[in-house]
């Protein structure tokens, strides 16, 4: 049982590190897209995304990983590997980012949070 737990933890750690690297690698492109928009909310969102350089990863379900920042617990990123769908939730607008397998931004929409 201990071996299974260690193996699961090892696999989870490796998978988390890979997703974290891919997410951070995609941040410059995402920030560029957000920064080129006219709306102030896009610029503030880009600043929030930059703070994700320090993230902690925790499981959000069987098919998702959740990233929360040390700076603001209200900033949460949920990445669902099956659909490569990242949801960034803050106290302000919600950004839904649909991405490809390489985490290149394919579609981006900002809408008011409920």
Curated annotation (Swiss-Prot):
GO cellular component: membrane
Annotated compartments: Membrane
Ranges that cross the membrane: 14-34, 75-95
Keywords tagged on the record: Membrane, Transmembrane, Transmembrane helix
Membrane topology: Multi-pass membrane protein
Main location: membrane
Name of the molecule in the record: Putative uncharacterized protein UNQ5815/PRO19632
Taxonomic lineage: Eukaryota, Metazoa, Chordata, Craniata, Vertebrata
């Amino acid at each position: 049982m201990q071996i299974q737990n260690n193996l699961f933890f090892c696999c989870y750690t490796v998978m988390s590190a890979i997703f974290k690297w891919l997410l951070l690698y995609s941040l410059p492109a995402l920030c560029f897209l957000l920064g080129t928009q006219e709306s102030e909310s896009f610029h503030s969102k880009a600043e929030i995304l930059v703070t994700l350089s320090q993230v902690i990863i925790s499981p959000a379900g069987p098919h998702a990983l959740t990233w929360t920042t040390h700076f603001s617990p209200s900033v949460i990123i949920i990445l669902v590997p099956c659909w490569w769908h990242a949801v960034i939730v803050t106290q302000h607008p919600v950004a839904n980012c649909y991405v490809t397998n390489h985490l290149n931004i394919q579609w981006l929409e900002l809408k008011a949070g409920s």
